[in-house]
Structures are given as C-alpha cells and as structure tokens.
C-alpha cells in the first residue's frame, strides 16, 4: 500500500497519477486531501463548481460532492473506466482522507514528483473550495 500526501499537490495532476497507478493494481491511500490545490482564478473556479451543483434536481441528480476528500475521489473516479470490472476494482483500492488518520501517521508518506506547486499564482485549496460550496 502506498500513502501519498496531497499537501500542495495540483488536483488534476495528482488525480491522473493516482488513476494510472490504480489501474496498474496498486493500493493507494491519499492523506491531507483538503490541502490539495487547484490553480487558476479563485472566483472562476468557485463559480464553475457552483454551476455543477445547480445542474439537475435533488431527486434525480447528478450529485456532486462538496467535501475535499469526495471531490478528489470523484476526480480520480472520473479518470477510470467505471463501466468495466477493472475500473470498479481500481476505484475500490483507493482511499482518500481529509487529514492524516492516526493509524496511517506511522507509515511512510511520500510526495509525488511533478505534481507539487512551487511558484504558481492564483491557487485555491480543496478545503477552501469546500467551504465555499458549503460542504465542510
């Protein structure tokens, strides 16, 4: 089992990296999902996510997540072929946590190369986005 720290990681790049590893058969646990970031204009990102929430109805959906861990898990799931068994099993091997749980603190946590922000202007964390959507 691999434990990946999402602190400062770019949301889409991290999701693509994890989805690929899940299809290869690895079990992956992601911690600190609320600290993952989306790059771009903060107001535009919030507006786009709120537009998604307004689509459909309460009874029929589609249902979009509001919490950081579910937003990240949904983006990973959207990159997997869910209609076939391989994709369903891959998503079942993925665990996402808002913070670091006590039982995982003891394990080796790694950062993924190439997905961490260094000098990017205009970012919003999934935790802040979740607060704007009303899901924290």
From Swiss-Prot:
Disulfide bonds: none annotated. GO terms for cellular component: cytosolic large ribosomal subunit. The keyword Ribonucleoprotein applies. InterPro entries: Ribosomal_uL13 (IPR005822), Ribosomal_uL13_bac-type (IPR005823), Ribosomal_uL13_euk/arc (IPR005755), Ribosomal_uL13_sf (IPR036899). This is Large ribosomal subunit protein uL13. SUPFAM superfamilies: Ribosomal protein L13. This protein is one of the early assembly proteins of the 50S ribosomal subunit, although it is not seen to bind rRNA by itself. It is important during the early stages of 50S assembly. It comes from Thermoplasma acidophilum (strain ATCC 25905 / DSM 1728 / JCM 9062 / NBRC 15155 / AMRC-C165). Part of the 50S ribosomal subunit. Keywords: Ribonucleoprotein, Ribosomal protein. One of its GO terms (biological process) is negative regulation of translation. Gene3D superfamilies: Ribosomal protein L13 (3.90.1180.10). Belongs to the universal ribosomal protein uL13 family. CDD domains: Ribosomal_L13 (cd00392). The gene is rpl13. One of its GO terms (molecular function) is mRNA binding. Pfam families: Ribosomal_L13 (PF00572).
């Amino acid at each position: 089992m691999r434990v990946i720290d999402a602190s400062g990681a770019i949301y889409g790049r991290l999701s693509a990296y994890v989805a690929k590893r899940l299809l290869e058969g690895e079990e992956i646990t992601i911690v600190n999902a609320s600290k993952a970031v989306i790059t771009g204009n903060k107001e535009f990102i919030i507006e786009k996510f709120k537009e998604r929430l307004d689509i459909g109805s309460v009874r029929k959906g589609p249902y979009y997540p509001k919490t950081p861990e579910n937003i990240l898990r949904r983006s990973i799931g959207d990159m997997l072929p869910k209609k076939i068994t391989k994709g369903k099993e891959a998503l079942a091997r993925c665990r996402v946590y808002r913070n670091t749980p006590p039982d995982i603190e003891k394990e080796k946590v790694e950062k993924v190369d190439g997905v961490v922000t260094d000098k990017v202007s205009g970012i919003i964390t999934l935790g802040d986005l979740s607060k704007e959507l009303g899901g924290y």
